[in-house]
Amino acid sequence: MVDMSEIYKNKKKALVRGSGDLATGVGVALYRAGFQVIMTDIAVPLTVRREVAMSRAVYEGRAKVEGIEGILVRSYQEALAVLEENKIAVIVDPKAEICKEFHPDLLVDAILAKKNMGTRRTDAPYVIGLGPGFTAGKDVHAVIETMRGETLADIIYDGQPIPNTGVPGYVGGYALERLIRASGNGRMEPKAQIGDIVKKGQL
């Protein structure tokens, strides 16, 4: 495990909107680069790969991904205390109001809502958006391509990424077949754990 204490003597500040799996990848990378990281999310976050997402902290109070711990906080002062412990602060703050107190050097919108949920290029010295919904040079400084394929992770400094197709990327020859959609509203009780081997028709 890398000792971050020396890096943290000259730390910069990053605010990540969202705390799902992709947002967590961003947050972890920034943490390892020496940034203090605050992640914001909605009160009931939806996460595809929740075992590797800081969004679990919203439900459980804390989450750990690759040895890096995220702690749920309720205020900016609590967030500062968590940052002093060299951990990531996670806060329920859908509009990222904490940005006004935190004054981040970098803001990354990793909500993946397929549209801009209020992020502005003036929110921080450097503002980056993930996926469709952003225009580099207009509402953000840069956009990261999230569409699977040869352009994945391309950095766009002028213009937009590939539009949302509504169809997930192909994995093993399957796209829409990889999704299970609920037939109605309600609470889901899982019958298998993430990582379990399942068979077609099992559920």
Regions found by a protein language model. Name each.
Residues 2-203:
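Well-ordered secondary-structure scaffolds
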